[in-house]
């Protein structure tokens, strides 16, 4: 059975995990790290770079480097590169492809099935877009799971009955969830958050501060210099991390820009107190979702058994202090790595779905109410927020006018009483209603939410049996053929990357062989017969010529030729050595005689192993 992985597709970093003998293991990527930056870059030569390599070259390639694309999921955001449009699903698919590749390399087998996590506050469109990103990357997405739900699964699998508060502050999204665990059931009682608040915003405050300080000191606005801004962003992130463990840090960026007087350098001290002052309003924004969750769940603070911190941003001392203050002095549980816990939970959920993990039932909830617009622009809710999913609810509606031939069903997601103030997810029309006075027709509207949080809406005229259906995807859903096209495109990029890698390897082998052969000829000039030397030099010259071009096949052929003819160097030298030995007569001693056997008898085309050598001499 094919292995299934759990993927935490984060705003700033992503993690992939797999079950090994029933235990979740975080997979180390090709660069040797356990987290992969969610950064995609398009090099000038057309190569797609993902992860650490993309992040490293961002300074010199700002316009062609894309980060934090998760914030655009489910929107019509696009980026145009080399005359080609890329949407958030395609960019995310590049990150997922890398995680898939790293997992395959680690496991030594194909990986197709995956569970991918999303913030609890993601709406329908954002969830659908995440699922599509997985499909474009060539993954069969078994389930889209809320991040705090995954964290609870990783944390609470073998625990007793308890209430857990998950405080998840990542790079770009923030949510708070309250979960009940017991009898193998993980149930999300309430969830709330802000999907435009995260560590990136803390970094941005430091960047703004540095720009302001530099402008007042040098009169130069660094905000207008893209490359300088990129360096500032990296330095701000580093400073934020350092201030989590020390009370002061220095940001030193030489040659940040130049003025008429010459190059300018940035050198600023930043204390933890200053940093906390700069970001105090961001911390304040974390409070409302917390209070909302406690109110929605209808519990007292004293009922919370454990507090779990998720996301690298929770390492900031001010955040940890805030959580302690909000929860009435409760210390957060330190037994979980905040960067990896979500991916671990996703791997466990993949195990549940594959039947590898037993005795766990995962109950998720819908984060926002769902309903339709009725007369007067009112939002009539069919499914209240925090309803456990999968779920199905239906209600009977009627017409507002006499002889109304059709009804328009407009689906909304949100908590406002007026439909227009909520997020519109889609609309469709049920036509062909028979003429009747208003209030007579009976139209049943049913909302059906599947385990991924994707909703299907049906409207049925109970009089005629006419029915109209739609899958609500917030307008972001891509047609199947579009997803297929993008998947093929992603595969094509992967093939191109593979071809580039092969070409680079062939070139490296060729260059290495040229160097080794030329060195050998130089070191053994007097021992190599003239005709052999000429033949080898000719093959080397031909290979050097091919290395100037770009034809990989020709480079490979020329390399093989050099490898073949250079064997004659060794043969010629051994023949000379044997001739010299024969001319000198047999050396005395039994050992010498044993070693002096015919060359062909004693040549083994393999590594020398002591045991074999003894056997051979016996």
UniProtKB/Swiss-Prot annotation:
Ranges annotated as biased composition (Low complexity): 580-593
- Name the source's superkingdom: Bacteria
Instruction: Tell me where in this chain the PTM Phosphothreonine is found.
Output: 173
Keywords from UniProt, A to Z, are: ATP-binding, Chaperone, Nucleotide-binding, Phosphoprotein, Stress response
Q: Where is the composition biased (Basic and acidic residues)?
A: 487-505
**Induction remarks:** By stress conditions e.g. heat shock.
* Record GO terms (molecular function): ATP binding; ATP hydrolysis activity; ATP-dependent protein folding chaperone; heat shock protein binding; protein folding chaperone; unfolded protein binding
Per the record, where are the segments of Acidic residues compositional bias?
601-610
Q: Which Gene3D superfamilies match?
A: 1.20.1270.10, 3.30.30.30, 3.30.420.40, Actin, Chain A, domain 4, Substrate Binding Domain Of DNAk, Chain A, domain 1
Which BP terms from GO are recorded? chaperone cofactor-dependent protein refolding; protein refolding
Q: Where is this region: Disordered?
A: 487-512, 580-618
| NCBIfam families per the UniProt record, alphabetical | PRK00290.1 (NF001413), prok_dnaK (TIGR02350)
Q: What's this protein's function?
A: Acts as a chaperone.
UniProt similarity note:
Belongs to the heat shock protein 70 family.
Name of the protein in its database record: Chaperone protein DnaK
């Amino acid at each position: 059975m094919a292995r299934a992985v759990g993927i935490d597709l984060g705003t700033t970093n992503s993690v992939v995990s797999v079950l090994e003998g029933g235990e979740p293991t975080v997979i180390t990527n090709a660069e040797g790290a356990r987290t992969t930056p969610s950064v995609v870059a398009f090099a000038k030569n057309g190569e797609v770079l993902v992860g650490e390599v993309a992040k490293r070259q961002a300074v010199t390639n700002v316009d062609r480097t894309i980060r934090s694309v998760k914030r655009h999921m489910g929107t019509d955001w696009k980026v145009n590169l080399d005359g080609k449009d890329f949407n958030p699903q395609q960019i995310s698919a590049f990150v997922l492809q890398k995680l898939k590749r790293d997992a395959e390399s680690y496991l030594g087998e194909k990986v197709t099935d995956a569970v991918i996590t999303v913030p609890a506050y993601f709406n329908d469109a954002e969830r659908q877009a995440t699922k599509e990103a997985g499909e474009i990357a060539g993954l069969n997405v078994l389930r889209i799971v809320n991040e705090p739900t995954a964290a609870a699964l990783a944390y609470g699998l073998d625990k007793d009955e308890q209430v857990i508060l998950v405080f998840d502050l990542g790079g770009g999204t923030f949510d708070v969830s309250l979960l009940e665990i017991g009898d193998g059931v993980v149930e999300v009682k309430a969830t709330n958050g802000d999907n435009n608040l995260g560590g990136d915003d803390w970094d941005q405050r430091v960047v703004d501060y540095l720009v302001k300080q530099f402008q007042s000191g040098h009169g130069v606005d660094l905000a207008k210099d893209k490359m300088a801004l990129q360096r500032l962003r990296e330095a701000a992130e580093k400073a934020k991390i350092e201030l989590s463990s020390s009370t002061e840090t220095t940001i030193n960026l030489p040659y940040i820009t130049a003025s008429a007087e010459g190059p300018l350098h940035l050198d600023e001290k930043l204390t933890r107190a200053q940093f906390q002052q700069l970001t105090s309003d961001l911390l304040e924004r974390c409070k409302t979702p917390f209070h909302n969750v406690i109110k929605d769940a209808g519990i007292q603070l004293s009922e919370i058994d454990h507090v779990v911190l998720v996301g690298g941003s929770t390492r900031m001392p001010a955040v940890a202090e805030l959580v302690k203050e909000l929860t009435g002095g409760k210390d957060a549980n330190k037994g979980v790595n905040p960067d990896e816990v979500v991916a671990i939970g996703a791997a466990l959920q993949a195990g549940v779905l594959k039947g590898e993990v037993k005795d766990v039932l995962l109950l998720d909830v819908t984060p926002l109410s769902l309903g339709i617009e009725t007369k007067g622009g009112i939002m009539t809710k069919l499914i209240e927020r925090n309803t456990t999913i999968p779920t199905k609810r239906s209600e009977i509606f009627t017409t507002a006018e006499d002889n109304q031939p059709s009804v328009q069903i407009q689906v909304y997601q949100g908590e406002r009483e007026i439909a227009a103030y909520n997020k519109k997810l889609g609309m469709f029309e049920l036509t062909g209603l028979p003429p009747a006075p208003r209030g007579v027709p009976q139209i049943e509207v049913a909302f059906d939410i599947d385990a991924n949080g994707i909703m299907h809406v049906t409207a049925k005229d109970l009089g005629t049996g006419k029915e109209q259906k739609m899958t609500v995807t917030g307008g972001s859903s891509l047609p199947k053929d579009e997803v297929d096209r993008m998947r093929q495109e992603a595969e094509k990029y992967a093939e191109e990357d593979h071809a580039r890698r092969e070409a680079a390897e062939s070139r490296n082998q060729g260059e290495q062989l040229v160097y080794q052969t030329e060195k050998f000829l130089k070191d053994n000039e007097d021992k190599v017969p003239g005709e052999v030397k000429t033949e080898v030099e000719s093959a080397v010259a031909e290979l050097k010529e091919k290395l100037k071009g770009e034809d990989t096949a020709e480079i490979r052929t020329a390399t093989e030729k050099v490898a073949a003819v250079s064997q004659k160097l060794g043969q010629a030298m051994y023949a000379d050595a044997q001739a010299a030995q024969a001319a000198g007569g047999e050396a005395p001693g039994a050992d010498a005689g044993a070693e002096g056997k015919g060359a062909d008898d004693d040549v083994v085309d393999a590594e020398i192993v002591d045991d074999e050598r003894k056997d051979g001499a016996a």
